Amino acid sequence: MSKQSALLSAPSSSLLLEVVEGALVIQHWGAPLAGDLSAIQTAIRPSIANSSWDAPQFPGIMRESSRGFLGRPTLSGHRNGKAWSTKFEVSNFHHDGNSVAITFTDFHAQLEVLITFDLDRHGVLTQKAVLKNLGDSQYALNEFIHWLPLPKEATQTLDFAGRWSNERNPQRKEIATGTWVRESREGRSGHNFSIADIALTPQTTFQTGKAWATSIAWSGNSHYLVEKLFDGSQSIGAGELLLPGEVILSAGESYSAPALISVFSGQGLDGIASSYHQHLRSRELHPKRPRPLTLNMWEAVYFDHNEEKIKALIDVASEIGIERVVLDDGWFHSRRDDRAGLGDWVIDPAVWPHGLAPIIKYINDKGIEFGLWFEGEMVNPDSDLYRAHPEWILHEADRVPPLWRHELVLDLGHEGAFNHVLEQTSAVLAAHNIAYIKWDHNRVLVDAGHLGSAGVHRQTQAIYQLFAELKKRHPGLEIESCASGGARVDLGVIDLVDRFWTSDNNDALERQTIQRWTAQVIAPELLGTHIGPTHGHQTGRTLELSMRATTALFGHAGIEWNITEATPDERKHLATWAKYYKENRAHLHTGKMVRVDYPDSHAYLHGVTAHDLSRAIFAYVQLTPTLTVHPSPLKFPDLDPSGTYSVKAVFPAGKPRFMLISPPEWMSGVTMSGSALAAIGVTAPILAPANAVLIEITKL
């Protein structure tokens, strides 16, 4: 190894960097390294192939053509057609513990890049970069991509695709020669946004095998890339997708690339998830107090804001044990449907003649917090704001972008528009006891210009600034990121919000998969998971309360249902379930998520185990009918093999629909060793499709 080298190590992974011939080379990102590493460069130095370079080339992480690299570079840009090719040299190398900062300089191109790597104790690698223009002329940046090398054993990738009400569906495929790109061009991360891009081996499952994951910390346009070159080398990367002219650096100006947050796991996809979750939980900004049981009134009242009707909802919510109530869309000026009012963030006296203060007091007097819905980035053409300032929308030339849900996008890069949203929102918050806001974003950005230039980059920075200012002005305020459901769930906005609305789809059967894969990166306590109505408003499907309640339990739980229509038995079960959630949320929101590699594709077995292996709560979920009479046994990993555990089924929201004469005997209670639970397990109950049962496992 050279004198300029650094080994960053965590219990689960290592990153080895070395300066070779002026370039920074990542020699290893993967399993932990130890011992004498001095001979690694000699051991892995490539041979000279036929019809190739006369000497080995080391393009390093800048991936430059000037160093013989034939793939996609890290940096692309120019000075009016000049300085299009760079050859950076490492000019400073600072290694401190598990962090390293490297400065690269190209005096000919008059550019400087500072790249930092930080590996935390959970194995999460944070990669940042700042590009600075050292010259006197402007530098137009096309793109800056963070890259990490992949070993050849990583022959597959896993990413995620989706649409409204059906987010984050897994896509697993082979890595072929070429450059493979997943782009998000919505101006927000999007329903089709891949929350992570994961390279893995064919043998990798939830519980076993190697995986290399990346997740971009950005809420605007972005792209993930996997590249395999004809020489056999392969890499994974991500960055902001810049539109033409979005970043032009004048003399002395800098561009900070969105961070890339990456994890290596030798323990499958659950190892990846565990690292991300522990990393998020270690943040100073991570929610500290218990996640309040929430009632969102949207599917109960929609735009029918009748005070007596809402009070009746509050009365039932109080009986059940709700801790936070959210008044959704429809409270502000002229908002009688979704065609008008966006942009006019003042209380509508026609609907609330005495304002919101009386209903908030009614809610607070029952010991319940109050939350309110906003969609500050949007404006309806039928609004006072748009009539006064039609120039405040994102647009190009004299064109008006096509409407989406009767909305246009307000240009928050415009000082007047930004201040309008900030001041009107802040005024409502200052005048009322509002603990929480649900911030929606219900359309994509197209033809999104700002004063004649592309405006998505600026818009993304502006919403971050707006959230930060609202929290500064209103200490303790919690913000939920919603975008037609789960279209802004990412590691860019996460330090500014306290909750994500996972999906507009409250159908528990659909939510099982949506929540399963969203939690691949996002800790469950940050994901809104609600009991929807008996007859789903999105799918029309009718589901048992026990299924809906079990599904909602594994996240930041809540209800989105007109509970005044619930039967007495349903209300009783909701109260029992609410009590169960409160008693167990500390475990559910701090433990390790486990997704068992269950052999029957018609069912899920998942849960949360305590880090000290003292207890676990699992759900067995029958998605569709099994092909055999008796499903595969339920086996539980991540327990103490030598420990003794009690195992029983629990029914806080009533029993599921069984398809059997007598249930398995263990459901009323059995004692087994951790090793037996992992190797033999217990008999699976025969459930009707779209049903679930909760299983408690407690160490004796």
Enumerate the language-model features and the residues they cover.
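Polysaccharide-binding surfaces and accessory modules of carbohydrate-active proteins
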Residues: 4-16, 24-227, 644-662
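Conserved, mostly hydrophobic/aromatic
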Residues: 12, 129, 252, 325, ...
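Carbohydrate-binding surface patches
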Residues: 12, 196, 598-641
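Glycine-rich, aromatic-flanked loop segments that form ligand/cofactor-binding clefts
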Residues: 55-85, 206-222, 263-285, 322-329, ...
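Short Pro-Gly-centered flexible turn/kink motifs
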Residues: 247-265, 690-697
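Aromatic-lined carbohydrate-binding/catalytic grooves of carbohydrate-active enzymes
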Residues: 288-423, 436
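Active-site neighborhood of glycoside hydrolase catalytic domains
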Residues: 353-355, 389, 393-546, 556-558, ...
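C-terminal beta-sandwich/jelly-roll accessory domains of carbohydrate-active enzymes
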Residues: 624-700
